[in-house]
Amino acid sequence: MRVTFYTLGCKVNQNETGALAQLFEENGYTVVSNEEGADVYIVNSCTVTNFGDQKSRKWLRRAKRENPGAVTVLTGCYPQAFPDEAAEIAEADVVTGSGNRHAILTDVQKVLNGEEERVVDIRPHEKGERFEELPMDKFAEHTRAFVKVEDGCNRRCAYCVIPRARGPVRSRDEASVLEELRRLAAAGYKEVVLTAISLPSYGIDSGTSLVELIEKAAEVPGIERIRLGSLDPDMLHDDDIRRMAAVKKLCPQFHLSLQSGCDKTLRAMRRPYTTAQYADIAAKLCAAFGADNVSFTTDVIVGFPGETEDDFEASMAFVTGMRFLKVHVFPYSRREGTAAYDFADQLPEHEKEARSRRMTAAVEEVRAAEAAAMQGRKASVLLETPLSATMFTGYTKQYLPVLVSAPGHKTGDIVEVTLGAWDGKRCRAEIV
């Protein structure tokens, strides 16, 4: 039996798809690409935006049209957040949510065996439920491993459907995380990325903390770099920053979730910080890790209900002033079940798209300028994708993309380089 996956959304989704692929392989399936043709087609959905839901439905329709005898599966955040809507998608033979992922295998088998014509198996998340272990030892990227350490979110931001899609915070057992890190190190992975739905919430339900996990992860032999997923700035305290700065393996690249650079919009979004508080946290990280050594990335939503042109300009001024190395810009997507769905002053789609283009152009200028400012600096680069026998792409600790000629080296090596010119996509570099 052949199975193929189509994944939408965040690194957590990508991690879970990899774990599901491993689960199917361990039960006799062969994982193939989307183009090869399969007996089972699985879409792991994202529901952060309406567009994500549309892409899931479109992919299912195409899979069923081109492979009418195959079993099609819709799983993940979309059916969990909108179970009634997802259950009505005729092109999906199996519909499951974001929990109890191990059951997908059984659900698929029921349809394949003719025991059931169709299976809808969406189980609500419940308070007190435990983190679902989905072990994974192999990654599409052979140099960097993504390790899921937490699921769920206890916040209720006005725009966000994720708490509905993922349930409450559930932390993975620390021993389980460390055991996976040891397996990854033994397999040759040198960099790990700790991923989660609400990474700073790790441990609040189990009496530990993210900082403690980072400190213990750094003790695993063979792991040379630890990178963090998205962080909420208000959840980073002074002692956390001090302890993190003492972990030399921790990459000084921080994805600090912003969402807007306008205080009025942040209040409407129900984000628990101001732009001044955000900038203060960033300044403390710069002081702890070194201003020339640290980099910041973030997410920004434009076109939130009630955002005036002045609000947008204020947001853009703050965002560009923060000198982010990378900004993911999203036009606001109205999601049923969120507080903002019922807000007045919803902006037209064309205005949201126009603001998205303006913000993107502004932050790309900053990205180019920040990359250019690094020219001449020394940096360590993890070699990742070989373009030829000697030419590689890779990333610095600050997550700056680099192109370097490295004769005698191989994928997975960490090399010292001098950064050169920015070509619009990456920095050229030379081995020191």
What is the predicted function of each stretch?
Residues 342-432:
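Terminal RNA-binding accessory module
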Residues 1-202, 239, 244, 250, ...:
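Proteins enriched for Cys/Gly/acidic motifs involved in redox and nucleic-acid/cofactor modification
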Residues 2, 67-68, 220-227:
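Short, surface-exposed connector motifs at secondary-structure boundaries
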Residues 256, 299, 319, 327, ...:
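Hydrophobic, well-ordered secondary-structure elements that form the walls
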Residues 186, 211-212, 219-220, 225, ...:
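Radical SAM/AdoMet-radical enzyme domain recognition
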Residues 47-52, 189-216, 220, 232-239, ...:
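Conserved glycine-rich "GG(E/T)P / GGGxP" loop and the immediately following alpha-helix
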Residues 206-218, 238-252, 307-324, 349-354, ...:
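Short, electropositive alpha-helical surface patch
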